[in-house]
Amino acid sequence: MSPEDFSHVAFHKVFENEYATCELEEMRRPCDGATMLIIHADLARWSPRILRECQKQWALFRPTVPHNIFAYPLVPDARWEKFISYFGFVPLIAAAPCNDGETRPIWINYARQQQHHEPIPE
């Protein structure tokens, strides 16, 4: 299952505040109707307080979606990996082709998993 095989259906707002926007992109594979949910987060600023607020919003949102949620970085680096792991995402695929022609790692937050969050740095 690669993002390259799927077409965009809709964006669903997870939360938005003055420093962060988080949306869930719903994608569908035309050949069989399979759905893939991809999380997108844009941070205008970074701080431990903003991270805590994002985690609080995520904790309210995640139980409402009974499906796996995927994530991939625009630019893969250790900072992105650390950030996404704060929300329970784990590596799934080291290199998957994406719709824009780039190859990126895919991370997953499994549905109904015991959510484990790393402690927030102060």
Each PLM stretch: what is its role?
Residues 22-33:
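A conserved beta-strand-loop-helix scaffold within acyl/acetyltransferase catalytic domains
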Residues 3-20, 65-66:
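A short helix-loop-beta-strand connector motif used in the catalytic cores of GNAT acetyltransferases and
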Residues 90-105:
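Conserved catalytic-core motifs of GNAT/GCN5-like acyltransferases
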Residues 1, 115-122:
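Short intrinsically disordered terminal tails
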Residues 13, 35-37, 101-108:
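Short beta-strand micro-motifs in enzyme catalytic cores
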Residues 32-46, 72:
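Conserved acetyl-CoA binding element of GNAT-fold acetyltransferases
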Residues 16, 70-85, 97-99:
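Conserved beta-strand-loop-alpha-helix junction that forms the acyl-donor binding cleft
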Residues 47-62, 82, 86:
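Conserved acetyl-CoA-binding loop-helix of GNAT-fold acetyltransferases
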